[in-house]
Amino acid sequence: MSRFVQDLSKAMSQDGASQFQEVIRQELELSVKKELEKILTTAPSHEFEHTKKDLDGFRKLFHRFLQEKGPSVDWGKIQRPPEDSIQPYEKIKARGLPDNVSSVLNKLVVVKLNGGLGTSMGCKGPKSLIGVRNENTFLDLTVQQIEHLNKTYDTDVPLVLMNSFNTDEDTKKILQKYNHCRVKIYTFNQSRYPRINKESLLPVAKNVSYSGENTEAWYPPGHGDIYASFYNSGLLDTFIGEGKEYIFVSNIDNLGATVDLYILNHLMNPPNGKPCEFVMEVTNKTRADVKGGTLTQYEGKLRLVEIAQVPKAHVDEFKSVSKFKIFNTNNLWISLAAVKRLQEQNAIDMEIIVNPKTLDGGLNVIQLETAVGAAIKSFENSLGINVPRSRFLPVKTTSDLLLVMSNLYSLNAGSLTMSEKREFPTVPLVKLGSSFTKVQDYLRRFESIPDMLELDHLTVSGDVTFGKNVSLKGTVIIIANHGDRIDIPPGAVLENKIVSGNLRILDH
């Protein structure tokens, strides 16, 4: 009789279903452990230690995944955060700046999350290398911003890129172009975890390679991995040794996430004398943000609650703009000393995000991830700061790209600011159809970016192209039905117009 069957019969005779499940769990953990050990034997000697750390990290995550079942929050315990735990930005700004700005800046490290590819916008390679404004990429703008700070205040703020195995090689190739910039640039890699078969829960990978048949067998486990991989890289200790105190973490595709001197001053000179270990920038929800994670009070601490954690019966309540008015921008300010302490105590607690995927061959897999902001509850004296919407300017689609390329924004030292010529501070709602999804197609359809200073809403669907010097105002809806094509002529001014049908402009 196999050991598994013996265990099973023993379990059944003892405590029924729960005991049975526990045995199954233990067997699964043992099977996964054996599979991971097999994979580790295929690692080349120079990658062995690094791979072992990754696989050990995955085993811990997998163990937690097997323990947790159902929504990870008890809805009855969720409360609105107390007034003083989320401060308005105006109050932080009113404290002004210190006499010596460079002294606080020299305590800062800027970390950009650079693990993502540009696939959702039809681009190969790292998303950070997509051109967003005047030929400048996300990475160019980031370097320009920090160089401007270092030159203006005679400081040494370094830039750190958290790459993934998907982006590391291409990013490193491009970094040499910044050799003469006044910014020290460091990189470290996110962990690389194995995807698991949805049915068997065993790793899909058979060896450490991530090419050939193994291309889809591995994944970067979400930005919550920053704490462990930053610590393991040795950079955390290096920066603490240099006297750095805080990291400012943000997504590289959020063009609003610039270093804010008022927030930094608040951290370095806390008004109540109690150092704040974690600041999350939040901003007011609009209808477009209803799925964003929100800050709540939970068991006496600030806690980030994501839509995936909410019991189904309460999802509509979670999306309510009146009850939960703010959402997480993923601009975070975190104490380096606190990260070191919590990492060494194994005390950083983040909910697991179970992300189902289907591989090209049709195999259903899951990947286990964590989110950087979810760790807020592990830090002491955490704070939310309700910042202006201008600090949240993510470019996820070509619709977002159209906004940041337009005359709605002006570019100065790598930072985008809303044009003073726009009469209202809100950003227009832009929805470009599937013909515009890929950057290449999008660029082909605009001879030049339209004037959008007075635009409120733009919807474009179907085969549509724009000539030079087009001006869009109010609400503009352009719909070319299947088989039709619409060419908006050069110099056209469309104000509160619906354009449909067929409009071809041919060269004479």
UniProtKB/Swiss-Prot annotation:
> Which residues are recorded as binding UTP?
L113, N114, G115, G116, K127, Q190, G222, D253, K396
Per the record, residues carrying N6-acetyllysine are K438
Q: Which GO terms describe its molecular function?
A: metal ion binding; UTP:glucose-1-phosphate uridylyltransferase activity
Provide the residue positions that the database annotates as binding Mg(2+): K127, D253
Positions of the region Critical for end-to-end subunit interaction?
A: 502-503
| Region ranges (Oligomerization) | 457-508
Quote the catalytic residue positions.
Answer: K396
Q: Which Pfam families match?
A: UDPGP (PF01704)
- Give the residues the record marks as binding substrate: G115, G116, H223, N251, I252, D253
Q: What top-tier enzyme class does this entry carry? A: transferase
Reaction(s) catalysed by this chain's protein: alpha-D-glucose 1-phosphate + UTP + H(+) = UDP-alpha-D-glucose + diphosphate
**Which Gene Ontology CC terms are recorded?**
cytoplasm
Pathway entry:
Glycan biosynthesis; glycogen biosynthesis
Instruction: According to the UniProt record, list the residues that bear Phosphothreonine.
Output: T426
Record-listed E.C. numbers: 2.7.7.9
Listed under GO biological process in this entry are: glycogen biosynthetic process; glycogen metabolic process; UDP-alpha-D-glucose metabolic process
Q: Which residues carry this modification: Phosphoserine?
A: S13, S434, S448, S461
Localized where?
A: Cytoplasm
* Location, primary (coarse class): cytoplasm
Blocked amino end (Ser) modification sites?
S2
Q: Which UniProt keywords apply?
A: Acetylation, Cytoplasm, Magnesium, Metal-binding, Nucleotidyltransferase, Phosphoprotein, Transferase
Q: How does it assemble?
A: Homooctamer.
Annotated family: Belongs to the UDPGP type 1 family.
What role is this protein assigned? UTP--glucose-1-phosphate uridylyltransferase catalyzing the conversion of glucose-1-phosphate into UDP-glucose, a crucial precursor for the production of glycogen.
Q: How is this protein named in the record? A: UTP--glucose-1-phosphate uridylyltransferase
Native species: Bos taurus (Bovine)
Q: Which gene encodes it?
A: UGP2
